[in-house]
A protein has these predicted regions:
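Ordered alpha/beta subdomains of enzyme catalytic regions
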Residues: 2-228
Length: 229
């Protein structure tokens, strides 16, 4: 997640619920719609890097992380940015539970090699000092442009990285594909998403329904998605 100096024009917001309206203009994002979206939905090396920062007393160092991509999907000329609402909801609600901490302490990769005081610190970690800058969700974007900029203490920003990439990659892929189909079909055609039976699991199906609609589809066969959104 590195890029040239950003030129984002959106305004920053604090990640906590009592903050001002965030970039992208969404006033209230609540929680994520996917129950799998938790602080543990990350790569192990993010936790080991966080521990290294903590041991070196660099965990509170001010830092900036930026999200970008290198190539448009489908050999196309543009991408539609999506997933920002989920990113913001995830960051606002980010908090490790006692159960999460107990699990991390029990793992072979961390428990036997990590100072126990690190887990105590981790249990109190939050996103109070995290700020986000972003282009508006649904914007046409291009490769190597900064899309999201995360500012805050180094350790927490590191722990957010993997999940942010996950929440935006698939969302942008589906939204872009839907927009391409809408452009090809024209404005007068009715487009219905019917991918549930072939989707990559329930969470993939729900996401596909949501972001197909964002990309220009008129409806979905997915009854649950219709109820949720």
């Amino acid at each position: 997640m590195n890029s040239p100096p950003p030129k984002l024009k959106s305004t920053p917001f604090n990640a906590r619920p009592n903050s001002p309206p965030h970039a992208g203009g969404i006033e209230d994002v609540g929680t994520t719609f996917n129950p799998l979206c938790s602080p543990l939905l990350t790569d192990l090396y993010q936790l080991t890097m966080c521990y290294a920062y903590w041991k070196a007393n660099r965990h509170l160092q001010p830092s900036t992380f930026e999200l970008f991509f290198r190539k448009n999907p489908f050999k196309g000329e543009f991408t539609i940015f999506a997933g920002l609402t989920e990113v913001i909801a995830f960051i606002r609600n980010w908090s490790l539970t006692r159960k999460d901490i107990d699990f991390l302490e029990s793992t072979q990769a961390l428990g036997a090699h990590v100072d126990s005081n690190f887990f105590k610190w981790l249990s109190k970690l939050n996103t109070d000092d995290v700020k986000i800058y972003a282009v508006k969700e649904g914007t046409v974007i291009f490769p190597k442009e900064p899309l999201i900029r995360i500012e805050g203490p180094l350790a927490i920003c590191q722990l957010l990285e993997t999940t942010i990439v996950n929440l935006t990659n698939y969302a942008s892929l589906i939204t872009t594909n839907a927009a391409r189909m809408r452009n090809a079909a024209g404005e007068k055609k009715v487009l219905l998403e019917f991918g549930l039976r072939r989707a990559q699991g329930p969470d993939g199906a729900i996401s596909a329904s949501r972001y197909s609609f964002m990309g220009g589809f008129d409806g979905t066969s997915n009854v649950l998605a219709s109820q949720m959104f």
